[in-house]
Amino acid sequence: SPAWSGAQTFFNPALPESERLAAVLQREIRETLANTNRTPLKNESVYLLKALDMPSALVEVGFLSHPDESKLLADEDYQKKVAAALYRGILRYASGETGKR
């Protein structure tokens, strides 16, 4: 739907470290891309998140159904910004950050 936009991070609430990972990633996405105010959401139905016994998060970086976001997602510079945000988020998670400021 064109009504939806912005990156969204999901986690399995059964693993507390997954929530921390999702929070750090979502915060970095919000700060770097400055196009969403979303917060991480619990998701107990995604198989991969349920099956893994290690911290994990699913990041949907945008909506192809949203015309403006679809253009951004096709832009190489924007793709690099998204990748950099995820990279920095993983580094922050590994260093022990909580995702809160």
Regions found by a protein language model. Name each.
Residues S1-R101:
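Active-site-proximal helix/loop segments of hydrolytic enzymes
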